[in-house]
């Protein structure tokens, strides 16, 4: 499913928003949401 990026997931995660330090815990980023 889709999920929101989080600031708490830094290691081993994909950056999601360009101008903010948000990353995806799992899966990959599509624009500003995380897809598994």
Curated annotation (Swiss-Prot):
Keywords associated with the record: Disulfide bond, Ion channel impairing toxin, Knottin, Neurotoxin, Secreted, Toxin
GO molecular function: ion channel regulator activity; toxin activity
The organism's place on the tree of life at top rank: Eukaryota
Record keyword Isomerase present: no
Prosequence residues removed at maturation: 1-7
Disulfide bonds: 9-25, 16-29, 24-34
Protein's recorded name: Conotoxin Cal6.1h
Native organism taxonomy: Eukaryota, Metazoa, Spiralia, Lophotrochozoa, Mollusca
């Amino acid at each position: 499913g889709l999920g929101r990026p989080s600031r708490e997931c830094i290691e081993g995660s994909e950056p999601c928003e360009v101008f903010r330090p948000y990353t995806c815990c799992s899966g990959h980023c599509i624009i500003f949401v995380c897809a598994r």
